[in-house]
Amino acid sequence: MKQSDSSGLRVSGLCYRVEGRTLLDSVELSVSPGESVAVTGPSGSGKSTLLMCILGLIKPQAGTITAGGREITGLKSAQLAQVRRATLGMVFQFGELLPELSPVENVALPVLLDGGRHQDAYRRAEELLDELGVPAGSTPTGMLSGGERQRTAVARALITEPDVLLADEPTGALDPDAKEGVARLLFTTARDRGCALLLVTHDLTVASRADRRHELQGGILAEAGAV
């Protein structure tokens, strides 16, 4: 596995085409530890595709991706899964939590699946949920409010102490009050924990919280306001 001197997230020369359409055209992007970058753009412009490439769920035709000092482009599936668990945290629009499990069980799950001790996983999950303001009782996650579910999803993404935190429309399904709380939580948490945060959103109000904003259109990623 190739090691890099840089931490955070770096994308270089990334290209992805599907059915003759270019979604990512030599994309260049870097996010330093503790920094936040928001990517906006029209629906279907390739924003989520960029995140899927970083996660290794789809394979780009060209380019390199380095996360947490590790070049992950071209890794075999077993190596990629290991690096993804250790280096990347992900928050989706709808949380992708198991509704029948309690918040603690959902948050502890990544550690348990990676062979961690049950006691340690649950203790850490309870600490994170308390820190993020989520009830840590036995109530099924599916019965929580939308904001509480997203906070639980953030806790689950953080339990492995990732170098890079990815968020795909994390506030898109929330009411205004919950949206404000989750957005504030994401940006504050990334800064305080030294995570490189890359967030995809249609919401310019949410995007304005980021240290930098980029727009993806026609396959080209450019910093907002750049000439």
Residue ranges of model-derived segments:
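Short coil-to-helix segment of the ABC ATPase nucleotide-binding domain corresponding to the Q-loop/switch region
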Residues: 101-109
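Conserved ABC transporter NBD signature motif
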Residues: 63-71
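Conserved ABC ATPase signature
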Residues: 140-144, 148-150
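Helix-to-loop junction immediately C-terminal to a conserved catalytic motif
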Residues: 55
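Conserved catalytic motifs of ABC-family nucleotide-binding domains
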Residues: 161
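Catalytic Walker B motif of ABC-type/P-loop ATPase nucleotide-binding domains
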Residues: 165-168
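Conserved ABC nucleotide-binding domain
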Residues: 128-142
